[in-house]
């Protein structure tokens, strides 16, 4: 984790090690995701006068049903992550990439709670948050709308690979777990840990 100085990431970082029981015990329902409660870790670091730089995505960034109704079948997407562990080590920033939806967000690809994106999705992309980000104008099912959009639509869970006899080839496609079902499972998880 990057240490914050004056509200910005510094060149300093701190490694936080989680034991396997935390990882194995925090699966989000049937999704290929886990949740790691960080409040106690962040509080402990704060008591040691160590401030961690982080950003959050709150539920206000999730698309509402009436917004989803106007999504186009093909939407521009932006995702943020560390493909193959790559990041800007000097500025302590992840890599931002863009692409399009390869299947409509509102459909369940092959009956799963996922949709596909067509972008530079490589190993190490799993866990990357995916957003619809439009500046100036954006498509709707009825035409074009003027304005800006920033909506959290999911998290990459898998890189799509074609296995061939002598090699694997990356299809530049990724599976994305939709933010709505993810939020429902996070809510269930929070209720479960609050009972303990």
Task: Locate each region found by the language model.
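C-terminal cap/linker of serine protease catalytic domains
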Residues: 136-196
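Serine endopeptidase catalytic core focused on the charge-relay Asp
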Residues: 1-112, 118-119, 123, 127, ...
